[in-house]
């Protein structure tokens, strides 16, 4: 803007959007001592779950544990508002175990609203930001709202979700909206484009909701909760067990598939009205029928939206078909033959900024002090949003306080993997976190997220002194228990030794340490408990953590060595102002990609699409030659 507006108030940081990214970002900056303003279109929809009311799942649960370990909120609120919890992939190794909580969506929003509204240093208010105020150096110094109110600040975090230029579709009918019943954010996309950002479109969708009083559960397969409740948070003060509810499983039928195939042309994508890319790993039901034409049936999960609402979420059944057809489709599912639809499914397309325009700190490359987090960066999922939110919040606070910003290496956390992928790879579809995206998943488990990240959270000031004491006490217990298991031995001829041989079917030669016993296949800590050899002072989670560390010690040590070896080369910094076009040994594609993305390290450069190993070698040789020339110049001078 050419002339500065009259600022109504001044803050250190302004966060635009109060979804899952925005709440984590605002809480982080406020807790780190920044006076923070959190602006939202609707104070009654803070941390709303517009799609599935659930947190966690494969790879996503690891993100939640990591955010919690850093001092974030998503895990704590999920633990306080769950209606069902299950451990997914329990029959596989601990690297891919995934805790998933079905949450009460209204309670979740209310609890998070209470948290942000009672956070010191944080003001939450309504407002639609349409413009950014920059100084002469293209550094952000404020925002302006649709109704002309301006606020001064030193940093802005954009966490706008699906609201930027949002448009929802049901069949060929559409309207401007960020979510059903909520108007879209207008103006900010145009501002960002005017400032030189690349702005593109993505699409997502949500299924219909039906009235649970109209559903016949006897025709479905119950999906009960786990008997042993597990927790996202490492803070025992939020571990309150509550009554749980069942989810249910039904399946599509030949009639479902027939109706979809006959009416594909009526959907926004197949009808040609929307060409934005949707999420590959959360496809619409019509995409499933087209892409997996040989499959006779698809699983559909029926999930409660809360304890005190009749609404059921029909997971796996999002669609862009017209509303009258949606009811016909729903009634082809066993158990839903007489269902009443309370809300139709819809698709939503929205603007986003490809995240290659951000540094791994999540600050944009074009504008100092401007950060982006969540769906505006091209991700899908509450957990991915929360992870980016806390990183953007940490770094916005450090930017304001003139402290060095923090980059999360991909080999140390799923958060690091997520952000490295976003800032390095050219993604043209909504990005979802998967365990397969991490090369280091055996080390990056849920159970050790606090060991990996809580020291950092404490060092930067996000983890409180009380939380730090809880963490340290836990580490002391784990160390003491590991030592006890190493030194406690049982003899084959003793009654307990004979009982264990009988229980496991595995012989004990003369005597065996409990640690060695736990290393054996099929032997778990519960066996020690059963025979009076366990430690009653440990929580179930701590017993599990000790067992994993012992049972997989060899694999973990090997992966740790690989990480250290790779890190030595990966972390080699690249000059921010390096002229890649002046390096003739690089391919032209590599020069273009490296110039556009401007990676901070050799490791990041190696993961850019179009940059091959030969280019990395050429880059290393060039840097070596430049370093030698500088050394010679220094000696000669």
From Swiss-Prot:
Organism superkingdom: Bacteria
Residues engaged in binding NAD(+): 278-292
GO cellular component terms listed in the entry, alphabetical order: cytoplasm
Keywords: Cytoplasm, FAD, Flavoprotein, NAD, tRNA processing
PROSITE patterns: GIDA_1, GIDA_2
Gene Ontology molecular function: any one: flavin adenine dinucleotide binding
Annotated compartments: Cytoplasm
Cofactor(s) the protein needs: FAD
NCBIfam families assigned: mnmG_gidA (TIGR00136)
Family the entry assigns: Belongs to the MnmG family.
Name of the protein in its database record: tRNA uridine 5-carboxymethylaminomethyl modification enzyme MnmG
